[in-house]
Amino acid sequence: MYSPPKVELTHKAFLMTQKWSNINLPGALHYVTGTVRYRIRVFQQDRCCAAFLEVLSVLLEDWPCKLIVFVIMPDHFHLIVNPRDGNIQGFTGALKSLTAKKIVEITGDKRFRLKEPDRDGSTYQVWQDSFKSMPLWSGWMIWQKINYVHANPVRAGLVRSAKDYQWTSFRAFYSRSDEPLPVDQDWWWPDDLEKMSKAMKELGWNSAGQLCKK
């Protein structure tokens, strides 16, 4: 079981936690969603799903980050992660950039082409401009999103049971399987409570207590 940290928030801070804020909050888990441009269903191709997880696996080696759960849907993905530096914007940006290159190589889909190169010189765009993220730290918040992520394929009518969907962390999370990608059983870094308390003070939030423990 996980016990929630004792966290007291100002009303403004509480409202921020109830919606997509995209803030970097060191010490918290982050729930992230990324959506393919024009909702093109590239992840109906197993090769694209495998490539996404391959890139994610390599990125996790180079960028210290805990991977809690994930699911790849036909036109979007969900992750819950804990980057050690708290830089969820940088981590997600790197993931989207690297996976975009792979997806273009695999699909050759002309719908991703830009009329003119963007400011970085890229001639294609696979993902929607922005991403959505939400910081999580209490037990209720974390488990609500974990269950939401794993139930996504069932709600979409892709499978009858979450365990039957191939491109999810359900089996890795509950059975400690390595397929299709292992996840971290220990969600927290040793200094997460200290980092979160400092970050919350800088944001004008009040915090106290302990992080969720397994």
Segment roles from a protein language model:
Residues 1-214:
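Short catalytic/metal-binding and nucleic-acid-binding patches
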